[in-house]
Every structure is written in C-alpha cells, then in structure tokens.
Regions:
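Divalent metal-coordination and catalytic microenvironments
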Residues: 14, 29, 34, 53, ...
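General structural feature for long, well-ordered alpha-helical segments within catalytic domains
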Residues: 35, 97, 104, 108-109, ...
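Catalytic pocket of metal/acid-base enzymes, prominently hydrolases
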Residues: 67-88, 111-120, 124-143, 201-203, ...
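N-terminal metal-binding scaffold of metallo-dependent hydrolase/deaminase domains
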Residues: 1-45, 55
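Metal-coordinating catalytic core of metallo-dependent amide/deamination hydrolases
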Residues: 126-229
Length: 229
C-alpha cells in the first residue's frame, strides 16, 4: 500500500477500478493538487470521505467526436446509407451560424462533463467557444477537406485557426477528413504539417466497401457524389 502525501484528499468506496491494475475492493484513493498520488485498500490513514457503495473509475476519454452537433434533438436521417447522409450533413452545416455552433459545442462540453468524460478529441470546422477552467482536456482537430490542391490561402487559414485555438489554451491537431474527400497530395501535405509542429491527427478510415472501391479505382458512387461539390 502506498501511503498518501500530507494534505491529501482521501476518498474511500466499495470498488476502485484503476484500469492498469486489478480492481480494489473496499479501496481508497488519495488526491493531491488534482493528481492521484496513492491507492490502497481498507481504512485510509488520516481523514477521508466515505462514498460507501460507489465505484470510482478514471475519467472517460472520447477520442473522436463532433461537438458541433450536440444541439440536435435527434440524429440526422441515415436512410440511404453514408452516401445519402453526407449531403444532409453538408446542407445542415451551411444553414447554421457560428453562434449556434458555439452554443452547441458548449452544450456538448457540459454534457460530456456530466457523463464523466475528462478528455475529448473534437473535430473542429468553425469558431470555438472560450475555454473555461472547468472544461475537460480538449484536443481541437481542425478538419480539412479537398480533392483539388490546397491553396496557400487555405493552408494559412488553417494555421491561423490552429494558432487561435492554441493561444486560447486548447491543444490542437489536424483532421484530414477521409480518403474519399481529400487527395493523396493534400493528405501528405497535412501529415507533414502535423509532424513539423508535433500535432496529433485524426482521420475517418474504413467506412465501407464503397470507400475502398473509390480509393483503389477512383470510380464508383463516391466519385459520382463528389462531382457535385
């Protein structure tokens, strides 16, 4: 048993699930300065808070989400599959204003905290709300699409947005959308950009046989759809 440091907040409960080691029945956890510093079983040394039959687990991680959709009352219509769903997403995004999106993101952050989520990888397409000290850890991944070569102005716009998010206190990264919505040249350029600045990346991959057909042959239903954009 590791003894907690002085001035440590100790919490006892029925079960503690450290994830990296076996569960602790009748366990306790010590926290100093917002950091877990000790774990043990039985009665903790010194004062403690007893949560009785509760279970303590590490905060949940939502590694890939789109908080901008948090204000939807119900999911978008999925009839017709992914090829029909994508145009609905595009149409909805074009109808919204930045203030509505920021409100949706704020709502999503609040709901995440209420559900025990402490780290989020959010795909970002527009303005972002001001960071609060109570927010979970958020990695803002700037989404990029484009089959035609990315212009210097688009690259600069992306860099400006990332710099703004970084200065606001967010960790940032890049999200090349998907193989069917971004050319190989653009994907390579974005990977180089992310590597140069030590940024994380996220990408939609393996979303069905039609994606595989398009990436291998540059033909099929995906090609027909993309010709409209």
């Amino acid at each position: 048993m590791i003894r907690p440091r002085a001035e440590c907040l100790r919490i006892r409960c029925r079960w503690i699930l450290p994830i990296g080691r076996p569960a602790l029945e009748s366990g306790w956890i010590g926290i100093s300065g917002g950091i877990v510093t000790s774990l043990g079983q039985g009665i903790p040394p010194g004062p403690f808070i007893d949560l009785e039959d509760a279970i303590i687990v590490p905060g949940f991680v939502n590694a890939h989400t789109h908080l901008e959709f948090s204000n939807l009352q119900s999911p978008l219509d999925t009839s017709g599959g992914l090829l029909a769903w994508i145009p609905r997403v595009v149409a909805m995004r074009r109808q919204r204003d930045p203030h509505t999106v920021c409100d949706a993101i704020t709502k999503g952050i609040e709901e995440s905290l209420a559900a025990g989520v402490t780290a989020i990888g959010d795909i970002v397409t527009t303005e972002y709300p001001t960071k609060k000290s109570t927010d979970p850890q958020i990695v803002c991944l700037q989404e990029v699409l484009g089959l035609s070569p990315l212009s210097a102005s688009r690259i600069q716009t992306m860099r400006t947005r990332l710099a703004s998010l970084r200065s606001a206190g967010y960790r940032v990264g890049i999200s090349p959308h998907a193989p069917y919505s971004l050319s190989w040249t653009n994907s390579h350029s974005l990977c180089t950009e992310a590597s140069k600045h030590s940024m994380v990346m996220a990408m939609h991959l393996g979303e069905g046989p039609l994606e595989e057909e398009f990436t291998k042959t540059s033909s099929g239903p995906w090609k027909d759809l993309l010709q409209h954009y």
